[in-house]
């Protein structure tokens, strides 16, 4: 992060603006909106500046720049068309440790001005750090079209209720639930927009009198196969509302960072052959945190109901009487195959898909004869350690040794690597791969050369 995003309270604080033209005028409008006490320094000023001075909204100083103008100033903006003057202003401000913005010169500025979406008191700022101002502007325009115009009224109304909410609800979790109900209350938003104060009062009293369930809850969320962009919108919504996030090894840092900054994160990572936290302790942890009134997101890689032991955890919560819900995720078979250019079904090559756990032992009672049937795709989860056993059992059942296979390592991520070969080479390929990996077996793998689109490391 090259710049720390902050919002400055400049009301009644002296600020200096150097420049008297159109660019300086735009900056002056922002400072006026912020309630700053503005001194503007230039040799000449446009009509708007003269009008502002006439209305006593700011003070004009007709002169060349003098560093003495910086005395007792909180903030300065250099907005002239003379680079030497701008540099002089910046150097003088830096000597005095005063924040200075030089318009269109981020490399010569101690702070930069973002693109702003103004829904006062709600403010949204977008910045590219000066590297791509057009992109920042386009994002601002996009956000302007999405954010309702009455958000400011809703935010201001929330400010009026803050002290009452603190008195009414002792627990932070109860307050958060109240605010979330208020902010998604469509009828209240409409009443505020139409300035129907009587209706606003009625709806507000209903919110305060409605019982708030103080119990916590657990939401089982599938994080998808790796790429943070594959997290569902509903999964993102629950993640950003969670007080506590209990997550596994396969959940990426990028997805974790989408949670609230004040949310507690608890790692219970598990991998084949190693369990850092036993399953019964995970179950008890979820119950304990929910009973304490927290909103808990149990975040699992892929889809929690496909080899994720999600059902086991929910069975425990159901018996314990803890409320729960489920947000499905994109399972590894779907995500990794798509990012590798391997369709799981194809009219000419595969009429079905089998998802199989790779945690198979030599005495496991799998129906290997049905797995060796033609025109289907086999997807083995967590199968690296048993790859040679899988290879041998399928060949025993007359599945041709030449059937294409692929091992997808770190699928959908920037570290994705795909190892391709034939069934007879599966055990050998597995020795070159590491977890997490997915094994795909079937003629559809042969389409990868034509359909591959995602940049990865191929072997």
UniProtKB/Swiss-Prot annotation:
Location of region: Precorrin-2 dehydrogenase /sirohydrochlorin ferrochelatase: 1-204
Binding site for NAD(+): 22-23, 43-44
PROSITE patterns, alphabetized: SUMT_1, SUMT_2
Keyword NAD: yes
EC number: 2.1.1.107, 1.3.1.76, 4.99.1.4
InterPro entries found in the cross-reference section: 4pyrrol_Mease (IPR000878), 4pyrrol_Methylase_sf (IPR035996), 4pyrrole_Mease_sub1 (IPR014777), 4pyrrole_Mease_sub2 (IPR014776), CobA/CysG_C (IPR006366), NAD(P)-bd_dom_sf (IPR036291), Siro_Cobalamin_biosynth (IPR050161), Sirohaem_synt_dimer_dom_sf (IPR037115)
UniProt-listed CDD domains: SUMT (cd11642)
Binding site for S-adenosyl-L-methionine: 225, 301-303, 306, 331-332, 382, 411
Record region (Uroporphyrinogen-III C-methyltransferase): 216-459
Molecular function GO labels: NAD binding; precorrin-2 dehydrogenase activity; sirohydrochlorin ferrochelatase activity; uroporphyrin-III C-methyltransferase activity
NCBIfam families tied to this protein: cobA_cysG_Cterm (TIGR01469), cysG_Nterm (TIGR01470), PRK06136.1 (NF004790), PRK10637.1 (NF007922)
UniProt protein name: Siroheme synthase 2
Organism of origin: Pectobacterium atrosepticum (strain SCRI 1043 / ATCC BAA-672)
Name of the encoding gene: cysG2
């Amino acid at each position: 992060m090259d710049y720390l995003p902050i919002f400055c309270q400049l009301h009644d604080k002296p600020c200096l603006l150097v420049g008297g033209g159109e660019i300086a005028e735009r900056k002056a409008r922002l400072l006026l909106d912020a309630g700053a006490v503005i001194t503007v320094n230039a040799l000449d000023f446009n009509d708007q500046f003269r009008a502002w001075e006439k209305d006593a909204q700011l003070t004009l100083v007709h002169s060349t720049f003098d560093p003495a103008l910086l005395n007792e100033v909180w903030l300065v903006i250099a907005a002239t068309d003379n680079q030497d003057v701008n540099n002089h202003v910046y150097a003088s401000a830096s000597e005095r440790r005063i924040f200075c913005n030089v318009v269109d010169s981020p490399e010569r500025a101690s702070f930069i001005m973002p693109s702003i979406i103004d829904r006062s008191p709600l403010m949204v700022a977008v910045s590219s750090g000066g590297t791509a101002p057009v992109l920042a502007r386009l994002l601002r325009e996009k956000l302007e079209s999405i954010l309702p115009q009455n958000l400011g009224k809703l935010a201001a109304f929330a400010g009026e209720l803050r002290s009452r909410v603190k008195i009414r609800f002792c627990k932070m979790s109860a307050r958060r639930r109240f605010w979330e109900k208020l902010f998604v209350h469509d009828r209240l938003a409409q009443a505020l927009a139409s300035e129907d104060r009587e209706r606003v009062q009625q709806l507000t009293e209903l919110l305060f009198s409605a019982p708030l369930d103080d119990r916590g809850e657990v939401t089982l969320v599938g994080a998808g196969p790796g790429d943070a962009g594959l997290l569902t919108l509903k999964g993102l919504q629950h993640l950003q509302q969670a007080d506590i996030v209990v997550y596994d090894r396969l959940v990426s840092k990028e997805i974790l960072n989408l949670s609230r900054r004040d949310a507690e994160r608890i790692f219970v990572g598990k991998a084949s052959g190693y369990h850092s936290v036993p399953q019964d302790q995970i179950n008890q942890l979820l119950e304990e945190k929910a009973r304490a009134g927290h909103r808990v997101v149990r975040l699992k890689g892929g889809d929690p109901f496909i080899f994720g032991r999600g059902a086991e955890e929910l069975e425990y919560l159901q018996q314990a009487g803890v409320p729960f819900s489920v947000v499905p995720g994109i399972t590894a078979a779907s995500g990794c195959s798509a990012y590798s250019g391997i369709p799981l079904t194809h009219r000419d090559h595969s009429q079905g898909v089998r998802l199989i756990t790779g945690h198979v032992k030599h005495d496991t009672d799998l129906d290997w004869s049905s797995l060796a049937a033609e025109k289907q795709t086999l997807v083995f989860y967590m199968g690296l350690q048993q790859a040679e056993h899988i290879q041998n059992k399928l060949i025993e059942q007359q599945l041709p040794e030449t059937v294409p296979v692929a091992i997808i390592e770190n699928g959908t991520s920037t570290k994705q690597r795909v190892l391709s070969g034939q069934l007879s080479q599966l055990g050998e390929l597995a020795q070159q791969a590491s977890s997490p990996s997915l094994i795909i077996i079937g003629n559809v793998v042969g389409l990868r050369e034509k359909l591959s689109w995602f940049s990865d490391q191929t072997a």
